[in-house]
Amino acid sequence: MSQHGGMTIHHCTIDPCTIDHFTIDHDGVTIAVSRGGRGRPLVLCPGLNSTQADLHELAGLLRRDHDVVTFDLRGHGLSSAAGDYSFQSFLGDLGAVLATVLSSPGGSGAAPLLVGYSLGADLAVHLAAAHPGGIAGLVLIDGANPVPEPFLTPDVLPELRAMWTDLAARQQARQGTPRQVLLSGDEIAGLNAEIDVVRAAILDRYRAIDVPISMIMSTAMAGDGDGIAQRFNRNWRAGIERLVRQRPHITTSWLAADHGLVFTHAPEIAQLVRSAPGRAGRTAS
């Protein structure tokens, strides 16, 4: 165990690399972070209701040729609970992790590739737009989608609220584990409503980004069911089509999967990340 700038770092060896586990105190919350691997730096941001433990397969594959930083958002995994689960609070978590990584002792000084899944993709876009020069490129996995229609419409809101309440109840069984999620059903619903608003204006954020962007999207985000699922899937594809019309330099890959693609298609995603363009040699500014 060692101390660096207020961070407590615990070392453990996991083949084929050493993983450093440390915490960052930010905004009254303790953020759990892990770092290991070799190659160009990469920060992997999980999504709502997912943890770095859930993303272990993808992170392990990426560590073969990247120096990978993973972490748990507030109220998730090994990070502490919080009184605020707004989009801005989660954005602050990602910003704190990135700032710590860039200033850490022994770092290369190179700007990292920023990879975000679901909510993590939206956070990555907002961070990149607000801090030009801080990253080498973006890989966005099934998120940050400028969908033409909101998902939380009055006709489906009761069903979605019931689904999130049930999800929060089931997640109670994971409390005390690296896969715990502490948000209530109402907090999950509130954040999803905020994400609808965020995505309605996210095209403006894309216009402010000057690094390469790659999208990895699911063909059936909401699954293969009828009715609402098909409507959501059409809206999802329409959002990406809208994005590439306005930002044709963005590369897009589609995987035959639902929104759980990071868990079911980790090898394919890792390969796409490896081939993602980035500003080689770019240093953080």
Language-model segments: residues:
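N-terminal cap/lid segment of alpha/beta-hydrolase-fold proteins
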Residues: 2-30
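Flexible "cap/lid" loop of the alpha/beta hydrolase fold
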Residues: 129, 138-171
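Gly/Ala-rich beta-loop-alpha elbow adjacent to hydrolase catalytic centers
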Residues: 116-120, 124
